[in-house]
């Protein structure tokens, strides 16, 4: 497929975090871009402000009339239901229709491509790597699954010869990619609604890893059953972060590499999981040939990602953090970071489960990870692409938890319940529409400090 022959790009599901990055990219390179999404959001508002036409009704009459079959590419998300009328319109007329991952594969196949895979840490690692490469002057474009605070965008750079992409395991999407340098941050079970078993997920990651023929260009954590360059914190590895300390709320650490020791690197993202993500990005950038001083300067200036341990309020009296975590391992990482930064202080966690299937598959893990917090408010399950499942409810999950300070809180009661809590540390957690509530929670808390 030759993208140069495409004049128009139409997105079904344009408001998704990965889809919107592609929409920004095609808009930047001069294509006419428009699309459909089910609901308005902050992301769709930003796209509309950039000049992209978006509608929120499944209606073929709203498809631009000059989007002809010979000059239009249609990109869809797997979350689109089979009954979608616009989807059928394009299929029946033989339009070129591609998944997001297929298009990323087409864009990146003629570039020097970095791919970041893993059940957790993809967005943070790819964002740090994209930032390092961009700040060092590389001709890079990074497509990431979050809004990077330094750029207020999920697209970093406008380069033509180097790309950074998240290698998403959902729907085996990452098998469309052709990476020159890659990493795998983790291989925990997730997306069991797609894979069925954890063994099937592991097999898919192994197949992805096989795409990197030169194993000196594949970076892994020590516990993974893959052949590659090992990275670790305070353990023997090819790339080792050690002498880790906290100064003024930042990590300061050294990194041992095959060629040198990088001393006193500063990094502002809290939590050992983020330190590991940063180490992976450093290893990939170093292997690419990025100068040490450029890496050090860039990693110190990285401001994080929206909804990834994102500080909303940070004062002596009150701290409010928002995080996208939606898997027990990720919630454990949030808890570890909070306890490391605020030892001995009461922490309220507000969690909105994401997907009925994920809640079912990891219920015991969710119960254990959430019970670590001092107080827990559990919201209703956010369904996303799914229909309800019998017996899978937030009350069912709550009953599995051991923390006595826990309760179900309806969305309409959330502000009042948070206001009534005496916890000085508040964390909202989840991948659903809880993110849309963050501004109103922040406003209420600021008014009551």
From Swiss-Prot:
The keyword ATP-binding applies. ATP binds at residues 118-124. Pfam families: Mur_ligase, Mur_ligase_C, Mur_ligase_M. GO terms for molecular function: ATP binding; UDP-N-acetylmuramate-L-alanine ligase activity. Keywords: ATP-binding, Cell cycle, Cell division, Cell shape, Cell wall biogenesis/degradation, Cytoplasm, Ligase, Nucleotide-binding, Peptidoglycan synthesis. Cell wall formation. Belongs to the MurCDEF family. This is UDP-N-acetylmuramate--L-alanine ligase. It comes from Flavobacterium johnsoniae (strain ATCC 17061 / DSM 2064 / JCM 8514 / BCRC 14874 / CCUG 350202 / NBRC 14942 / NCIMB 11054 / UW101) (Cytophaga johnsonae). The gene is murC.
